[in-house]
A protein has these predicted regions:
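Short acidic/polar active-site loop segments enriched in Thr and Asp
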Residues: 60
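Conserved SAM-binding loop
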Residues: 63-64
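Non-catalytic interface/targeting segments
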Residues: 1-49, 53-57, 77, 83-110
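Short, glycine/polar-rich helix-capping loops at beta-to-alpha or helix-loop-helix junctions
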Residues: 67-72
Length: 110
């Protein structure tokens, strides 16, 4: 699987459509990271460009804060698992995701 975290600095970005950076991590069938995580700086905030990047990269799971219903429906229609309303640092969220294999909506890392 390939997960994409929508970031703002070290934290999950509060809004999908305002993100300017993402982190892509590959996970094998045993739940272990494979390869090096890849951080991509986006040229500017754009939900449409972010959706295009997600599809181009073959992402299977998206972890984000808030996301507009239209973008959520589009990504799920394309077969992606979208875990939204997540709050925490990228590091905490990845650790929690790897331990559990998923995140419940509205998960808050403290």
């Amino acid at each position: 699987m390939k997960i994409l975290l929508v970031l703002q600095g070290a934290w999950i970005a509060p809004r999908f459509d305002l993100a300017t950076e993402v982190l892509i991590i590959k996970i094998d069938d045993q739940g272990n990271r494979t390869g090096e995580p890849r951080e991509i700086l986006l040229p500017g905030p754009s939900a449409e460009e972010l959706c295009s990047l997600i599809l181009k990269e073959g992402i299977t799971h998206v972890i984000c804060g808030g996301i507009e219903e239209a973008h959520y429906r589009y990504l799920t229609w394309k077969g992606l698992k979208v875990m939204d309303h997540i709050i925490g640092t990228g590091r905490e969220v990845v650790h929690h995701f790897l331990a559990r294999g998923e995140l419940d909506p509205e998960t808050v890392m403290r």
